[in-house]
A protein has these predicted regions:
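Recognition helix of helix-turn-helix/homeodomain-like DNA-binding domains
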Residues: 2-15
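Residue signature of alpha-solenoid helical repeat architecture, marking inter-repeat boundaries
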Residues: 43-44, 80-85, 126-135, 174-178
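Structural motif corresponding to the intra-repeat A-B loop/turn of tetratricopeptide repeats
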Residues: 59-60, 99, 149, 187, ...
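DNA major-groove recognition helix of helix-turn-helix/homeodomain DNA-binding modules
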Residues: 19-34
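TPR-repeat structural position
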Residues: 62-63, 102, 152, 197
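"A position-specific structural signal for the A-helix of alpha-solenoid helical repeats
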Residues: 51-52, 84, 90-91, 95, ...
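Amphipathic alpha-helical segments of tetratricopeptide repeats
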Residues: 70-77, 110-124, 157-172, 201-211
Length: 212
C-alpha cells in the first residue's frame, strides 16, 4: 500500500479489509493464518469462494468446474479490488499450466504481478522489497514454467532472484518451505548442465536447510 494509506491505517482513520491485512502481514514475514480477524459478509463470501476454488483445483482436479468458479468469483470483484484480481489471475495461470500452455500462463502471471505493481525488475533492483505469498508464488511459477518450456537461462534469473530475496528476508521463513528447496534444485541442475559441478554441489547440499 502507499505511505499515505499506511499512515491512515496506523492512525485508525481507515481499516484494511481481511485480504489487505493478510497481504500486509505476509510482507512483514508473518503468517495471517496465525491471527484471527472479524470479517464482513463480503469478505466471508470471498473466503468461501477461494476455498471452493482451491478444492476444485487441488483435490478434485476438476479444471472446468474450477474455471466456472473463477468466473463467478470474478463477476463479484470490482476493478479496484486488486488483490482479488491477482488471485483470480494466479489460478487462471495455473489452469493454463495444467493444460501445458506455459507461454500463455506466464503472460497471465505477469498480468497478475502488475495488480500490485510488482515485477521481476522491481524485485531484482530493490533489496528492501517485501513480497506477499501470492507475489512469491507468481514469480516462482514464472521461473518454473520457463524452465519446463526449455528457457532455462531465463528461468534461473527468476530462481536466483527469489533465492536472494528469501535469504535476505529470514523473517519470512514460512515462504521458504514450499519453494526454497525447489529453487535450489533447479539452480543446481542449471549449474551442472553448464559443467559447474562445484557450484552445483554447493547448492545441492543446502537443498534441505536445517532451519526450514
Amino acid at each position: 500500500c502507499t505511505v499515505m494509506a499506511l499512515s491512515r491505517y496506523e492512525s485508525d482513520e481507515r481499516i484494511p479489509d481481511k485480504f489487505l491485512m493478510d497481504a500486509l502481514l505476509e510482507r512483514l514475514g508473518f503468517q495471517p493464518s496465525k491471527y484471527e480477524f472479524v470479517a464482513s459478509d463480503q469478505e466471508f463470501e470471498y473466503s468461501m469462494k477461494r476455498a471452493q476454488i482451491e478444492k476444485l483445483l487441488y483435490e478434485k482436479r476438476d479444471v472446468q468446474a474450477c474455471r466456472e468458479a473463477l468466473q463467478e468469483y470474478e463477476k463479484q470483484v470490482q476493478e479496484k479490488e486488486r488483490l482479488h484480481r491477482q488471485y483470480i489471475l494466479l489460478k487462471k495461470g495455473l489452469i493454463l499450466g495444467r493444460e501445458e500452455k506455459y507461454s500463455d500462463a506466464i503472460n497471465v502471471f505477469e498480468q497478475a504481478l502488475k495488480c500490485t505493481e510488482c515485477s521481476e525488475t522491481n524485485v531484482a533492483n530493490q533489496t528492501d522489497i517485501l513480497l506477499t505469498n501470492t507475489e512469491t508464488e507468481l514469480l516462482y511459477l514464472i521461473g518454473k514454467f520457463l524452465y519446463i518450456d526449455g528457457k532455462k537461462k531465463d528461468a534461473c534469473t527468476y530462481f536466483r532472484m527469489l533465492k536472494n530475496q528469501m535469504e535476505q528476508r529470514p523473517a519470512g521463513k514460512e515462504k521458504w518451505k514450499e519453494y526454497y528447496p525447489c529453487i535450489l534444485y533447479r539452480l543446481a541442475q542449471c549449474e551442472f548442465e553448464a559443467y559447474n559441478y562445484g557450484a552445483s554441489y554447493a547448492l545441492q547440499i543446502h537443498i534441505v536447510p536445517s532451519d526450514i
